[in-house]
């Protein structure tokens, strides 16, 4: 173990320890250790894995703090891995010199607006455990190419950029678990311009990632989890977002979970499951645009200023067994599907708690220019103007639902509405406590509904 104090570091929070830490990296055994104390550094500590051998950065049970006063990452872990996660693609030198760089039990703080926490490139099997990064720009910054990353039991807190930033990186296999990722101005977990596969986000608290706690810094559209594949050659597939608390304060253009794709022939984001989460308090709680093959199930999704779930230009989205409502009187609720096809909504409950209908005037479940949508076994209560409101839709099937207005003074105009143009729509075997509104140019067949 290379104790940085043995290489000249003071750890008193006053003396600049940059050169002492660099000396420990160059001459030590690879296990960089910071005893309890506060260590000032003014420049990046580069750890070239190919020349240093297996490496680690550790503090003393969380009592060690490194303060970065310069620009750039406090620590850069740079490897040479250009293969995949397949054992046959990993060169012997990677196993011998570079595998599993580990960071644990240490805190980082920034005193420069352009300081980052950790930057990783070319690494194989990197591990973060028990790490705090605060008051930096980006907390953990993954660039270029990495494989098999594990991040657990970490605090990425109150940074001016992104907590965990996958930035134009080719990365397969990454697990993020049991961590707090909160109050980061540009997002909690953000993926842009990258090729990512096998991402698991499980058991985390991801909250309040917007500009509201950052004083005069500019506010930008953000999300707790942001996946953006609009750049050329970027793609994200095989993602699990399970068992997290994902909430915020509403911000302009904000979302709790946002997945975006451009309209072209490239592979859209898909093979994504969002399950068993508590998601709430943003402009749009879940916003999907251009996705293909996403499942949203078993979530509590609450309190929006626009929609709980907004789906645009998407295909094969399965929405099942979720609960949608507002949580505070100033917020709203509801789902909206636009220009989407081959989707199902089943086993969901949607409830408008407002006395007079939502300020937005939105129905609980809206469809616009959609095709082949199955709505089955849902309970929609107190929707105004309608429980289900479809415009310019075809092949929409509403079956086995209960749609009612339970208010003493009803505010709903009806249970279901079809307007614009459309063909082969059906409403069957539902319990409806309001009328069905059908425009003349929409084909809707009714069968065995209880009114």
Q: Regions from the language model: what does each represent?
A:
Residues 18, 22, 26-72, 108:
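N-terminal extracellular ligand-recognition/capping segment immediately after the signal peptide
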Residues 29, 52, 56-61, 70, 77-136, 202, 240-247, ...:
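Parallel beta-helix/beta-solenoid
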Residues 106, 131, 154, 159, ...:
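Consensus "Asn ladder" position of solenoid repeat domains
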Residues 31-34, 45, 55-59, 78-79, ...:
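Well-ordered beta-strand segments characteristic of repetitive beta-sheet solenoids
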Residues 1-20:
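Right-handed parallel beta-helix/beta-solenoid
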Residues 42-47, 69-93, 111-120, 134-142, ...:
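Extracellular beta-strand/beta-solenoid scaffold signature
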